[in-house]
């Protein structure tokens, strides 16, 4: 029997507000344990939550970016559970009236086609703290993360393969990153993914029993975990077994999933409206204000790059991988840079430099204007393409004017025949054996003189002019 795969994803995104959702503590990542806490985070008796308006702003922007309807009257709920990293013994979340609902995004499949994935809801909530189990037999609780604002984005079960799930996550991350509400760095926990997967016989309408997957710390592991589950569940069903509703974690070392616990249902959390927070009214003016702050998203930018700038689909995709890179490209083109040349540099030397340095384009000194200036002085013959690589590294590390650096460092390309011809004559004088080989008709003897000339000019001879002048002077030797 063959089975159809049914996948839905729950994505937690940490919002990059300065303070937490219900307390004034810093929400920044990477501080010493429990440095970013106060009495609200520790749930001291009598303390009350105070809503951070910036979190609702971010929630509205996320909902708009994901084509969602927005609840005009929004409230919070208590999700009750006990765990050491949750000192209140409940989490403030949203249950029946999330900030956003009924959304969708398009994903690009491997065959080039597009598929629409529906999004059931996006709700705001507070993050929990973090438990660390030490080798000394003690467990430690760090509440820096407690109260950091989250938006949980829950898709419909519209994905039919691990590949589609991967494509959905890629598209979702791009959109959220473009809004600026989160850096969506999985390595820092600001984007976390839980996957729900079930199988059903082809032609059956009813969903099978789902399994939830956790510990998916990369998009690659999401795909691998889902692929393993497809095989595990299909094998179990074909042998007459029964799929239980359970939570499993992906074990990277063993390339498989391991049972964590039998899955709880929503009733286990005993949701009820949060009594310490009011109803929040979101009017059209507030929504319009947030909509005005949204950027042009990757899909629209890719279409523009292909249709208006004549770039390939591949180039357009690479240039929109991050908003910072796309913004850099657009600024460079607006300053007069040739779109294809700017694209080539960003995908070539710039990308290699960023990878080697472990940095993003915002973290280096290269700017759109000095890149455009460098491309211009390549085009006008001031420097060669080879010399430009040295100039680029200087600009990336130090910034400044490309032309000013070239002139100060003595890197201007030599194109004047009055300068080059005497150097060519000196090359002939210094390499009598090569001249003799050339005069005797030895095969490819003329090729050596190009290297001699470039060495004599420290690589500054204009290659095209040098080749032309060398050919003329060698012809004179032959005559």
UniProtKB/Swiss-Prot annotation:
It is an enzyme of class 6 (ligase). SMART domains: GatB_Yqey. The keyword Protein biosynthesis applies. It catalyses: L-glutamyl-tRNA(Gln) + L-glutamine + ATP + H2O = L-glutaminyl-tRNA(Gln) + L-glutamate + ADP + phosphate + H(+); L-aspartyl-tRNA(Asn) + L-glutamine + ATP + H2O = L-asparaginyl-tRNA(Asn) + L-glutamate + ADP + phosphate + 2 H(+). GO terms for biological process: glutaminyl-tRNAGln biosynthesis via transamidation; translation. One of its GO terms (molecular function) is asparaginyl-tRNA synthase (glutamine-hydrolyzing) activity. It holds the Pfam family GatB_N. SUPFAM superfamilies: GatB/YqeY motif, Glutamine synthetase/guanido kinase. Keywords: ATP-binding, Ligase, Nucleotide-binding, Protein biosynthesis. Its EC number is 6.3.5.-. Heterotrimer of A, B and C subunits. Allows the formation of correctly charged Asn-tRNA(Asn) or Gln-tRNA(Gln) through the transamidation of misacylated Asp-tRNA(Asn) or Glu-tRNA(Gln) in organisms which lack either or both of asparaginyl-tRNA or glutaminyl-tRNA synthetases. The reaction takes place in the presence of glutamine and ATP through an activated phospho-Asp-tRNA(Asn) or phospho-Glu-tRNA(Gln). Belongs to the GatB/GatE family. GatB subfamily. This is Aspartyl/glutamyl-tRNA(Asn/Gln) amidotransferase subunit B. It comes from Streptococcus pyogenes serotype M4 (strain MGAS10750). The gene is gatB.
């Amino acid at each position: 029997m063959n089975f159809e795969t049914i996948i839905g994803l729950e994505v937690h995104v940490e919002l990059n507000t300065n303070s937490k959702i219900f307390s004034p503590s810093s929400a920044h990542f990477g501080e010493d344990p429990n440095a970013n806490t106060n009495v609200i985070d520790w749930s001291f008796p009598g303390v009350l939550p105070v809503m951070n308006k910036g979190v609702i702003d971010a929630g509205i922007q996320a909902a708009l970016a994901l084509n969602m309807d927005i609840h005009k009257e929004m409230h919070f709920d208590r999700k009750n559970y006990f765990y050491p990293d949750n000192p209140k013994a409940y989490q403030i979340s949203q249950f029946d009236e999330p900030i956003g609902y009924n959304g969708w995004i398009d994903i690009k499949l491997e065959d080039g086609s597009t598929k629409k994935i529906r999004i059931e809801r996006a709700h705001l909530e507070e993050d929990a703290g973090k438990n660390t189990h030490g080798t000394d037999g003690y467990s430690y609780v760090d509440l820096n993360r407690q109260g950091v604002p989250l938006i949980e984005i829950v898709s419909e079960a519209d994905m039919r393969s691990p590949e589609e799930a991967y494509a959905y996550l890629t598209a979702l991350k791009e959109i959220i990153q473009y809004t600026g509400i989160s850096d969506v760095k999985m390595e820092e926990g600001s984007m976390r993914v839980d996957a729900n997967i079930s199988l059903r016989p082809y032609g059956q309408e009813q969903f099978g029993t789902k399994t939830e997957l956790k510990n998916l710390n990369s998009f690659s592991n999401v795909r691998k975990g889902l692929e393993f589950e497809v095989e595990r569940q299909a094998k179990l069903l074909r042998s007459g077994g029964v799929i239980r509703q359970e939570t499993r974690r992906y074990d990277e070392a063993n390339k498989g999933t391991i049972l964590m616990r039998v899955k709880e249902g929503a009733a286990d959390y005993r949701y009820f409206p949060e009594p310490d927070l009011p109803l929040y009214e979101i009017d059209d003016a507030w929504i319009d204000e947030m909509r005005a702050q949204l950027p042009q998203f990757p899909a629209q930018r890719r279409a523009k790059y292909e249709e208006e700038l004549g770039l390939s689909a591949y180039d357009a995709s690479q240039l929109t991988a991050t908003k910072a890179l796309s913004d850099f490209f657009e600024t460079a083109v607006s300053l007069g840079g040739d779109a294809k040349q700017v694209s080539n540099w960003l995908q070539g030397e710039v990308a290699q430099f960023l990878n080697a340095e472990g940095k993003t384009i915002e973290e280096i000194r290269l700017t759109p204007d000095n890149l455009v200036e460098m491309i211009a002085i390549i085009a006008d013959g001031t420097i060669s393409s080879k010399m430009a690589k040295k100039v680029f590294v200087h600009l990336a590390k130090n910034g400044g004017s490309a032309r000013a650096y070239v002139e100060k460092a003595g890197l201007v390309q030599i194109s004047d025949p009055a300068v080059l011809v005497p150097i060519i004559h000196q090359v002939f004088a210094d390499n009598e054996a090569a001249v003799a080989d050339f005069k005797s008709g030895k095969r490819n003897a003329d090729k050596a003189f190009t290297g001699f000339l470039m060495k004599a000019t420290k690589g500054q001879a204009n290659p095209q002019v040098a080749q032309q002048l060398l050919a003329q002077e060698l012809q004179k030797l032959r005559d």
